[in-house]
Regions:
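Non-catalytic substrate-recognition and accessory regions of acyl/acetyltransferase enzymes
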Residues: 1-81, 86-109, 119, 123-170
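His/Cys-centered metal/cofactor-coordination and adjacent catalytic loops
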Residues: 112
Length: 170
């Protein structure tokens, strides 16, 4: 059963938090937050801008495309190892292509924790890195993409995206 939780952020209209609970025990199985966001293609380096725009018909191209940010996602330790996280991402993706969805949304984006297991999880679920390397992402975020620089510290997260149009064409 899906329930809304975390009312403080919801009251301020900043994000919505949801959790799935077992109806018989009220145990939280998993939880996630979503917020409106966008992929601002016009501010990206030309190779990335072209990569994303190439999938959009010319007449529909815009400086940015609507996205939903999955801000937090967690599975209870009691249910880990049962692919609940995979099912949760499938649920979120299907939610935003449902005809009854109240908003247009082209992408699901995440700031994945910079750890190989997290990258493998999101890649297994169809997510791709927006930037091809830590260095490229770090340079863009810290230097506005002007000149290549060497990262001072490792990235804590990496931006990944899933193009929802893929589910429409399956």
């Amino acid at each position: 059963m899906l329930e809304q939780c975390d009312f403080m952020y919801a009251y301020q209209l900043l994000r919505k938090s949801y959790c799935f609970v077992k109806p018989d025990t009220s145990e939280i199985v998993c939880a996630f937050t979503v917020a409106n966001s966008s992929v601002k293609v016009d501010s990206l380096p030309s190779n990335l801008r072209n990569k994303l725009n190439r999938k959009i018909p010319n007449a529909k191209r815009r400086p940015q495309y609507p996205a939903v940010l999955v801000g937090q996602l967690a599975v209870s330790d009691l249910f880990s190892g049962h692919h609940v996280g995979d099912e949760l991402l499938d649920f979120i993706k299907s939610w935003f292509i449902d005809p009854l969805n109240k908003t247009g949304c082209r992408y699901v984006i995440v700031d994945a924790v910079n750890h190989p297991k997290m990258f493998e999880y999101y890649q297994r679920n169809g997510f791709k890195f927006l930037f091809s390397s830590d260095k490229e992402e770090w340079t863009f975020l810290h230097n506005k993409g002007l000149e290549p620089t060497t990262p001072v510290e490792p990235m804590k997260t990496r931006l990944m995206y899933f193009d929802l149009i893929y589910l429409r064409t399956k």
